Design a protein with these regions (language model features):
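Q-loop/switch helix immediately C-terminal to the Walker
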Residues: 4-5, 11-25, 37
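ABC ATPase C-loop
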Residues: 73-74
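Walker B motif beta-strand of ABC-family P-loop ATPases
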Residues: 80-82
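Walker B catalytic motif
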Residues: 85-86, 93
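Helical segment within the ABC ATPase nucleotide-binding domain
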Residues: 95-108
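Conserved H-loop
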Residues: 110-117, 119-126
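Conserved beta-strand-loop-alpha-helix hinge in the C-terminal portion
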Residues: 130, 134-159
């Protein structure tokens, strides 16, 4: 699960969270391999060489928090991921990287990606299979036609 504004946790480093998460999932990935993978992903996303040691989301920009969630998505490799406005706080270059990482994830066998977004470019580039619209009461309607998303983006919700 990814949040619109991830909570900072003092005293817990970015890598400690990943190590504990991987341990709880009982992955066979060795600590040295995990750290190497973490550092590689951080580098690909333009984060500092010391990102693994920084406290989780403490004094991190919105974009850094979102990039951290991408590292978590990649390393934990869940079957289903729910991302709340993953594009929030990202510049245009970071959105391109985000989009590619999310496409790569969604194209893996057996993966489901649920994204909450108001950003037309992200929706267009991800080309979702289905669109689900919730009303104020929480009732949902699912559409196989992606054009409903574009219509809502252009015209807003119609009651």
């Amino acid at each position: 699960v990814s949040f619109q504004n991830p909570t900072p946790i003092e005293g817990l480093s970015n890598f400690q969270l990943m190590r504990q998460s991987l341990n709880s999932l009982q992955t066979k990935d060795k600590l040295s391999t995990s750290l190497k993978n973490f550092k590689q992903l951080a580098s690909e996303l333009g984060l500092s060489d010391e990102w693994d040691k920084k406290q989780l989301n403490v004094q991190a920009s919105g974009g850094e928090k979102k990039k951290n969630e991408l590292i978590q998505l990649e390393m934990l490799d869940p079957q289903t991921a729910i991302l709340d406005e993953p594009d929030s706080g990202l510049d245009i270059d970071a959105i391109k990287v985000l989009t590619q990482k999310l496409k790569d994830f969604a194209n893996r066998e057996g993966k489901t990606l649920i994204i909450i977004s108001h950003y037309a470019e992200l929706i267009t580039n991800l080309n979702p299979d289905t669109v689900t619209v919730f009303n104020k009461l929480g009732f949902a309607k699912q559409y196989d036609d992606i054009n409903i998303a574009y219509d809502i983006l252009e015209n807003g919700f119609k009651q």
